[in-house]
A protein has these predicted regions:
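Glycine/threonine-rich flexible loop motifs
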Residues: 94-103
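Hydrophobic/aromatic ligand-binding patch that stacks against planar heteroaromatic rings
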Residues: 108-112
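Glycine-rich phosphate/pyrophosphate-binding loops
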Residues: 113-135
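Short, Asp-centered acidic motifs that coordinate Mg2+ and/or phosphate
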Residues: 85
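Electrostatically charged, flexible surface regions
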Residues: 134-267
Length: 267
């Protein structure tokens, strides 16, 4: 059993270390992670410069690229055979709702899914001290279920864990992605030279109320498990947009005629 572990917080992140150690009881663990923090790297791929790989230990590699780069290098080059399972995390901070669109943690799991590897993103609530041991225990439990039962096609698991001791967590809930609102997400400042610069930041002020919302599970002390599908097509809206297929195209005869060379007139 071969397990690939990666993240977006970097190779030296405590969450990565704790997760890899916990998974060593399940199978042979390979760690391939960015050489520095790559938070909010989303699904970026490095195309215009070479990637450097440094081996830091037995089956432990640091990559000078994004989380998605790490997954590609690991699955397609570094590992002797593709892994049976991929886990990305444990991320410092939750990846709930809209966060998944920006998260390098979740994107690494998405890339694993694209490459045909059953994958799970693991994130933990908090900002200072983290109960990564509790997060790792839940991650291992879900990982065993994935290995036993598999995942639906093109589907990954987004696991978020409240920052509590293991015995204080109230269980696991299957949830949906929620929506959030921010207050003043762009901060404008002036540097000592009088030039304007910006921080993309802001304070989350509310979550949308929806059935089985992921953030509500975390607020109530439960682990949030959200299945995410790669196909983001809004299938329910296809019929509505099909009427746009009747938008008039240029008259074929007129287009053909305009492309024909004009005959020379006799003088």
């Amino acid at each position: 059993m071969r397990i690939l572990v990666t993240n977006d917080d970097g190779i030296h992140s405590p969450g990565l270390t704790v997760l890899a150690k916990a998974l060593s009881r399940v199978g042979e663990v390979w760690v391939v992670a960015p050489d520095r923090e790559r938070t909010a790297a989303a699904h970026a791929v490095t195309l215009h410069k070479p990637l450097r790989v440094q081996q830091l230990g037995t089956r432990v590699y640091a990559v000078s690229g994004t989380p998605v780069d790490c997954v590609n290098l690991a699955v397609l080059k570094l590992l002797p055979t593709p892994p049976d399972l991929l886990l990305s995390g444990i991320n410092r901070g939750v990846n709930l709702g809209d966060d998944v669109l920006y998260s390098g943690t979740v994107s690494a799991a998405m890339e694993g899914t694209i490459l045909g590897v059953p994958s799970m993103a693991v994130s933990q609530e908090g900002q200072g001290q983290f109960h990564f041991d509790a997060g790792a225990r839940y991650a291992v439990r879900i990982a065993r279920l994935i290995l036993k039962e598999g995942l639906p096609d093109e589907t990954l698991v987004n696991l978020n864990i409240p920052n509590r001791p293991f015995r204080s967590i109230t269980g696991v809930r299957v949830t949906c992605l929620s929506r959030r609102r921010f207050d003043n997400p762009i901060i404008e400042k002036i540097d000592p030279h009088g030039r304007t610069y910006y921080w993309i930041a802001g304070t989350r002020i509310s979550w949308s109320r929806s059935k089985d919302a992921d953030y509500e599970a975390i607020e109530q002390g439960a682990v949030s498990l959200t299945p995410i599908h790669l196909d983001t097509t809004h299938h329910g809206a296809l019929d509505r947009f099909r009427k746009w297929e009747t938008v008039r195209r240029p008259n074929a005869r007129r287009v053909t005629a305009s492309l024909k060379p004009k005959s020379k007139q006799r003088s």
